[in-house]
Each structure stands twice: as structure tokens, then as C-alpha cells.
């Protein structure tokens, strides 16, 4: 169908799987995991009309560094769902990766003898994502990340599952049963495994400010301008400037939404 100017935009697609580690699938279906395949990516990109803006890769898996080298000029590469060590992560960034998906989740942490992929990202100017639903990451780690990476490199994300906005209950995610209770979604058969988020991006931004003490201006930038730049759509989205779409949320001091303006037209 022809897209009208009043329609909400699908700006891009994150191909979070299947080029990930079978040991760090999180809530993804392990049956779908495979090595990175440039031909498969290009076939999907053609079907998507060029909308795939980000491809997630576990660089330690056989052949995946070669995929990064081959495809990084066609799409942005993000390190994700990985068991990679520091040295392999450095090789991935040197090969062309520029991004890290949901930092801290589904990856090795930081220790003084094994700094891991997080420190590699910090040293190589990568953008990093944070799920600020107050379930995935402790507020102190959120503040730490803003202080170390800066709001020009932090991208707030919701990582929301299809259950987002729906009542508590049982749902399906990638062919697996999930249980939703409040802001938390988990695999039904493995209740300690978080299955995405049940919170929208605006509420994640709101929680970062009101519950995690992130400065408002930093949280707003990390939810708009920085992610737009990270996937290359900042000529149209992410900030208010001449030539960009006039997409605005008006809120009160408690960040309750009062109006939504989409492409210059008030829709809420």
C-alpha cells in the first residue's frame, strides 16, 4: 500500500538473530541460530527493501568475523548474544562493528583480568544500548554507563516483546511460551530467563529519569538523537531541526504525556 504522510514510520529493522552464540540465546529460539551468512543477509535485505539497519553478530563464532569484514559497509554491525572475550571483540570492532546490543545482557561482564566486550566497546567508540525498564539492569549500572560512555553513545531501547502493552498472562515469543507479570516477561519453562521487555521506549526513558536519576536531557537524547545517528536515519529523525520530521512528545514535569505531534500534526 502507498504510505501516507500521516502514517507512523517503520524506520528500520534490527536483525537480532540468527547470527548469535548458541550459548547466549537468551529468549531466542536456539533452533534458529546459525553462523553469519552474507548471502542470507542480502536476500533478507532485498526482501526488506533495505530496511535492515542493524545486524547482530557473535564475533567468536566460526566465520562471523569474516562476515563483519564483508558486510560492514552495507549495514551496521552490532555485537550481541555473545561469549566473546576482549581480544575477539577488539577484532570485531577493527573489522567494522560499531554497536553493542543491550549492553550487559547476554554477554560476559567486566572483571579486572578479563575486561570482555564491554571495555572493548568503550575503547572503540561504539554506541551501546541500554534497556532501562528497571528489570534488565541495576540503576547504578545505568548511571555508570551514561557517565563512562556519554549520552552521545548510549541508545535507550525497550527490547519489548509482542506482549508489550497487553495484560499479564501467557504469550508466545519465537515459538516459545513466555509469562508476563507487570514489567517482567520470562520464558515459561525457564522463569529465570528474561524474555525481552514488557515496557515501551517512552516508559523506559521515563524510568531512567524518575527511578534511576539520569538527567532528563541525557535520557531524551539517548532515546532519540543518538539511536537515530547510530543507524543512519538522523537526517530525518531524532532531533528537531530544519528539514527533519516534526515528531514531538509534549509532557508535564512528571513526564506524563500530554500531546503527541507526528510530522507536524497533533495525533494525541
What function would you assign to each model-found segment?
Residues 21-49:
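Conserved phosphate-binding/catalytic loop of the ribokinase/pfkB sugar-kinase fold
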Residues 254-261:
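Short, Lys/Arg- and Gly-enriched loop/turn segments at beta-strand edges
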Residues 8-28:
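Metal-cofactor-binding active-site regions of metalloenzymes
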Residues 1-5:
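Short, small-residue-biased leader/transition segments that mark boundaries at the very start
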Residues 34-38, 61-65, 86, 111-115, ...:
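Electropositive phosphate-/nucleotide-binding environments in soluble metabolic enzymes
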Residues 117-129, 146-158, 164-251:
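His/Asp/Glu-enriched, well-ordered alpha-helical/loop segment
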Residues 42-168:
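Active-site core of metal-dependent hydrolases
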Amino acid at each position: 500500500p502507498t504510505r501516507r504522510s500521516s502514517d507512523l514510520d517503520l524506520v528500520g529493522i534490527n536483525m537480532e538473530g540468527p547470527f548469535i552464540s548458541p550459548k547466549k540465546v537468551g529468549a531466542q529460539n536456539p533452533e534458529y541460530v546459525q553462523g553469519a551468512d552474507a548471502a542470507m543477509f542480502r536476500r533478507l535485505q532485498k526482501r526488506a527493501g533495505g530496511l535492515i539497519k542493524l545486524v547482530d553478530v557473535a564475533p567468536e563464532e566460526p566465520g562471523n568475523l569474516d562476515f563483519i569484514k564483508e558486510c560492514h559497509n552495507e549495514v551496521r554491525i552490532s555485537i550481541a548474544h555473545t561469549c566473546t572475550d576482549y581480544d575477539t571483540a577488539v577484532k570485531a570492532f577493527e573489522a567494522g562493528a560499531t554497536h553493542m546490543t543491550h549492553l550487559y545482557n547476554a554477554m560476559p561482564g567486566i572483571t579486572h583480568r578479563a575486561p570482555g566486550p564491554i571495555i572493548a566497546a568503550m575503547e572503540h567508540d561504539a554506541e551501546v544500548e541500554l534497556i532501562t525498564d528497571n528489570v534488565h539492569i541495576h540503576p547504578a549500572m545505568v548511571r555508570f554507563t551514561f557517565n563512562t560512555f556519554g549520552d552521545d553513545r548510549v541508545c535507550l531501547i525497550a527490547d519489548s516483546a509482542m506482549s508489550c502493552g497487553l495484560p499479564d498472562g501467557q504469550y508466545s515469543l519465537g515459538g516459545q511460551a513466555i509469562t508476563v507479570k507487570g514489567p517482567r516477561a520470562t520464558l515459561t519453562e525457564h522463569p529465570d530467563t528474561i524474555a525481552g521487555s514488557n515496557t515501551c521506549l517512552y516508559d523506559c526513558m521515563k524510568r531512567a529519569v524518575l527511578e534511576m536519576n539520569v538527567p532528563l536531557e541525557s535520557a531524551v537524547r539517548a532515546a532519540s538523537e543518538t539511536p537515530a545517528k547510530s543507524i543512519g536515519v538522523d537526517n530525518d529523525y531524532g532531533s528537531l531541526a530544519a528539514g527533519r520530521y516534526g515528531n514531538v512528545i509534549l509532557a508535564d514535569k512528571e513526564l506524563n504525556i500530554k500531546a503527541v505531534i507526528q510530522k507536524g500534526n497533533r495525533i494525541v
